[in-house]
Each structure stands twice: as structure tokens, then as C-alpha cells.
Amino acid sequence: MIEVKKLVKRFGLKTVLHGLDFEVRQGEFVVLLGPNGAGKTTFLRILASLSRPTFGEVRVAGYRLPANASAVRSWLGVVTHLPLLYGDLTAEENLRFYGRLYGVTNPSSRVTEVLEMVGLASRRRDLVRTYSRGMQQRLAIGRAILHDPEVMLFDEPHTGLDQDACDMLDTLLRDVAGLGRTVVMTSHDLTRVEGLATRFDVLSRGTISASIRREDLGKNDLLGFYREALAG
């Protein structure tokens, strides 16, 4: 579903990604771990066709990027750590707007379905600026799944949320993954993501330094694996 080979990304004289290789099969839930500045967001932006690679090959759903960016976007749902919603519109109006943008068939019915899925049906006619941070993030996920994408990209979705909002978000993330979607998520909160993903990759010094499946963690918890990967 996602295949990356020898990816290099430079900003001027600074190289952020150094020949990175990465592959995700359909239905996998992969969390990219790494310290601040490791290049996680840069990498996700390239997968989302929001940034161009300097060198290397990137394919999503068989389409090569950035040449087929418009085709790939129909396969993708993207959620950043900032919800980026229209605060002076209602939740329903936000989703209807994006439904038209995505060319969603029968948008009214789909908007209702998505609002119920993210637990906001009772607040559908409230202005989004009156929502809590957690509610806005749930609506952002609703927007991302509106066109029923095969691949979901989440960039630090727990950032700025309180404990209750994080718990609700985790439930929603499991629901999204349970529908068979391929998920790639960045995070630095190891405790929060340990029970979510099927695989954990560590991005360090611009490349994937280690990878492990959840069932292979064994007695070594995720924190121990992460520390060893950074020290290696």
C-alpha cells in the first residue's frame, strides 16, 4: 500500500531524511516514533503529497509521488496535530463543504453517518469554534474519513489533548483501523500508542533505525525498544 525507497529530503544545505526505506502493507497500523526534529512530520507531509522529496521513490496505492499527487489524494485521509477547521461554520457545514470538495456521493447521508461515528451528532449544528480541542480533533478525523480513504495519516493527533480527550481519540483510532484501513501515525507518546499499533518504527537521524511488531515486543516493553533504537 505504501512503498518508499531511498528517500532523501533536503531544506537548503540541511538534509532531514537520509535514504529512508519504508513499507506498509494494506491494513497495517504503523506508528512512527522519534524525538522532536527527527523528520517525522516532514516524512508524513511527503506521503500526503504536501511536500516534494529531493530524491527517492515514493508510492502510495501503486501511484508514484509526486507525479500522481491528485490521484493519490483520493486514497488518503490526513489529520494533523492542528484541526484546521472553519470555526464560524457548524460541524455539519464543515463536513458538507469537504464532501462537495471530495465529490462524495450522497453527502448529506454520509455527513450524518460520519458525525455519529465520531460522536458529534448531537452537536452537529453548533459552531466549531465553540468546540473543545478534543471535539475539534474528532471532527478533523471525521473530515479525513468522509470520502472513505484507504490510507489514513495522523501527525501527532494527541498533541494538546487532555486525558479524557485522548481516551476518546484512541477509541476512534481503533474504530478507524478496525475498518481495514492502512494507518500511519507519528507520535512521541509511547505509553499512549503502545496498545494501538501493529508495528512500531523508530525514525532517528533521518532514517528508520529500528522496527518491531507489537507481538514481538515480548518482555521488552516499547520504551525499552525505543531507547535501544535511539542508542544504536
Tell me the role of every PLM-derived stretch.
Residues A48:
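Helix-to-loop junction immediately C-terminal to a conserved catalytic motif
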Residues G56-A67, V72, A210:
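Conserved ABC transporter NBD signature motif
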Residues R96, R100-R123:
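Conserved ABC ATPase "signature" region
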Residues M152-D155:
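Catalytic Walker B motif of ABC-type/P-loop ATPase nucleotide-binding domains
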Residues S187-H188:
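H-loop/switch region of ABC-family ATPase nucleotide-binding domains
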